[in-house]
């Protein structure tokens, strides 16, 4: 993967000594993330997603454990197919009662970069959990791409400077 980006190999457990530091560099902590409790009402979830302008958010239980990911589509299909609800009636339905088509697979805080990138390729955000599966935050695909893009510019800049110096 990293060779495709022109950055050499990604750090490994052996080369860095602390893999957790690698992926946690990208972490948006739980206190800065919009998430939904599984016992919140469908209406509360819709309003939270609308307020934050998100199309998908992590779902956790009251003990802080990551349960899955809920999307706008999950909610709309639930309203149409499972509950046939008005918005007022949606106050009585919890997020846990909705079927989720797919969940964003989490990584553990001590996962390696390859695992993070593998998941980020197919998910807009990657939930991060601790060894007890407590939700601790997310890593966005945007942050990972931005980091590697900036690194690629750093690699290209010295090469450009060398080429300019050789011409003079």
Residue ranges, per PLM feature:
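Tandem CBS (Cystathionine beta-synthase) repeat/Bateman regulatory domains
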Residues: 1-168
